[in-house]
Structure formats: C-alpha cells, structure tokens
Amino acid sequence: MTTILKHLPVGQRIGIAFSGGLDTSAALLWMRQKGAVPYAYTANLGQPDEEDYDAIPRRAMEYGAENARLIDCRKQLVAEGIAAIQCGAFHNTTGGLTYFNTTPLGRAVTGTMLVAAMKEDGVNIWGDGSTYKGNDIERFYRYGLLTNAELQIYKPWLDTDFIDELGGRHEMSEFMIACGFDYKMSVEKAYSTDSNMLGATHEAKDLEYLNSSVKIVNPIMGVKFWDESVKIPAEEVTVRFEQGHPVALNGKTFSDDVEMMLEANRIGGRHGLGMSDQIENRIIEAKSRGIYEAPGMALLHIAYERLLTGIHNEDTIEQYHAHGRQLGRLLYQGRWFDSQALMLRDSLQRWVASQITGEVTLELRRGNDYSILNTVSENLTYKPERLTMEKGDSVFSPDDRIGQLTMRNLDITDTREKLFGYAKTGLLSSSATSGVPQVENMENKGQ
C-alpha cells in the first residue's frame, strides 16, 4: 500500500492537524470543495501565543470539517519534557547555552496523540503543514506510522494541484475571502514562530541570515533582556526535586506538573532565561539556524544538573552527558520512542534521576546570567570536610598520598617510554627546552 499520497484522495476521510491559521484553514476548505471528507484535530500544547483553543474547532467546522476535536496534550508534553531533563537529552549547545529540544518534544506528543484520536474516528489518512525541507515531515511520518501501521500520508503542500491553485499566503487569503470568509492575513513578521508550553522556536525569513540577531525577535515567553530600557530586578528562586522529579518552586509544592511548568515559565520568563541562538544540523544534514526560548526548562535544567554534580561520581556524570547527547539527537530525529532511545531513557532515569533529591537556590538576573546561592540534598557526596585545607581530622594522611603518588610511577614510566617511541618514528620532535618530545610546530615545519 502506498504510504504517501501525492494527490487528494477524493471521497475519503482525511485527518488534518488543524492550527486555525491561514495555511490549514485554506487547506481544509480546499479539500472539502474538492470532494474529500476532512476531519480536524487540534493539539492543545499550551502554546503561549494561543488565546482561545475552544474557538479553533468551531472555525474548522465552519470551513467544512466533518468533525473537529480538541486534544489536550499538555500533561503528556510536560511529562516528556521532564523526562528529557532527567536524561539531559539535549545535543545542540553553543557557548554553553542549550537548545532544549522543545519542538521535537512537541512533535513526539502531537504525532502520537493526534493519530491515536484519528484512529478512534476511523480516519487513516493524515495531513499536516510540514514542508519537505524541514525536520517535522520526517518526525510526523515516523510517529504517525508508529501509532497506526495502516496510516497513509497526504500533505496538501506536496500536492501540485493544491500548490498550483493556492501556492502562497496571498492566494490562500484571497481564496478564503472569495468563499465568503473574511480571513485577513496576519501581519507578516520578519521570522516564523512555532511554540508549545515547553518553549518557542523562531526561525526562517530574516533569521536565515546570520547578520540578523536575537535583537529582531519579540519574545513570547520572556523579555528583551538585551534591551537596557527593560527593567529586570534580580530574583531569588528555589527549586526542589524528589527522585528526579521537580515538585516545588519557592516552597510551593505542585501536584500538577502542568501548573508547575507554567510557574517555572513565568519565573524564568521574567528574566529572559533559556533564550539561545543555535546553528544546527537538520535530519537531512543541511544546517539551519533558530532562536529559541525555554525559560521553565532552563530553570529546571540548571537546578537538576547542580544536584547531579553534587550527588553522582565522575564516571556516572560522564555517562549522563554522553548518553544524554546521544538521546537528544535521537529525539531531534523523531526517534524518541525507538528502542535505542527507550534503552537510554530507562538507564538514565533509573540510575541517575532516581537519586536527584534536594533543593537549589538561584539568583536570576538578565538573560542567562545567574548565580547558584545554595545547594541542599541528603544525597550529596560533596563533603567539604574531606578536603578541607584547615587543620583537623582527615580521612587520609600525607603518607597515604605519598603511597598513592608512588603507584602513579607505573603509568608515568609507560607514558614516557611511549613519547620517546613516537619521537623515534617521527610523530613527535625532540625539544631543546623540554625534557619530553613535543608535537612539532607546524610553522617551523613549513620553514
């Protein structure tokens, strides 16, 4: 059976991921007029720029949807976001600033929950607004087929008939007006924005050019921290984790993770925390650029990793970072529920996150400028008395350290012999100023 349909399947049910924007509105109306039976599905992901979710299904019905459903995905989205924090599932960083994979997390939830709802309604053809150059077309493809093995894909934006008739936003707006809907195009921004409760992505248009900076972006989850006219007073915040799970902010315990994430967003957003500018590799290996917001994720991540470094040993922390980066890449590629990802998630949550209990107090200032003021945990292996420089009882003596250093002679001797062996083969050069062979200076080599 053909998985991807290039032309409209007339007379058949088609589920469309309906945002209520111009593109999906025009596509839904066009499909109905051409003889398909569209069903509209809207994911409530807690988008910070969406004012009225209940109005979206009503609009879909007006445009010709056979049925329209609003699917509340917020609880699952936050659960996956917390899992990503527990696992450090983030692989894109620049200068120490992290992209928290908020769009990939949203796609994992949307792609599974909407297709599951479609399956309940007997809808086995799915359409969405992703383009053929982006990551989402592959993410939705994978998650959709994982959820429904009988699923077929129809995307109006890959249908030449649709493109010929409604190839641009102006044509779509004119089409809606001609059909009796007073649909005005929204004011065009200098970039495109996609968001959910975990974060916002700003990309494309002017942001494709690297001489356009974060300063052209109007944050939707935070403030313009780079604008000196914006007053941002310093603020102390305390985050508490229990067995890897964030449970309290500033002493207030949350039984609802959605409410906890909303409050974390409010706190971090007041400072512009978690905003970053990233050049990344898309799934197809072409580079793209995005400016991201994730105030709540950033706040929780900082506190989590502070506890992590005080609780776990060096080798465990090294594995956390290595496996987290690997898992982050799988998440980015739309493989969050693949077996290799589940294996990594299980080990990181079981053996790392389960021990993360305690409180971290921070002072937030402007943007990503903050200080850690205090760290408290019953699980800390950080024991200042072990290494104190003050006189007193010690867990080991000077003689113990002499013995430990003497044992190092074994590998130091081996290393010295290897260095001189490399020099004999020409890999290293002898140095008049050093007692050991050195890597040859390339400038001298060319003279």
Curated annotation (Swiss-Prot):
SUPFAM superfamilies: Adenine nucleotide alpha hydrolases-like, Argininosuccinate synthetase, C-terminal domain
Binding locations of L-citrulline: 99, 135, 139, 192, 201, 203, 280
Record-stated family: Belongs to the argininosuccinate synthase family. Type 2 subfamily.
EC number: 6.3.4.5
Record key words, sorted: Amino-acid biosynthesis, Arginine biosynthesis, ATP-binding, Cytoplasm, Ligase, Nucleotide-binding
Protein name: Argininosuccinate synthase
Gene that this sequence comes from: argG
Any Pfam family matching the protein: Arginosuc_syn_C
GO cellular component, one term: cytoplasm
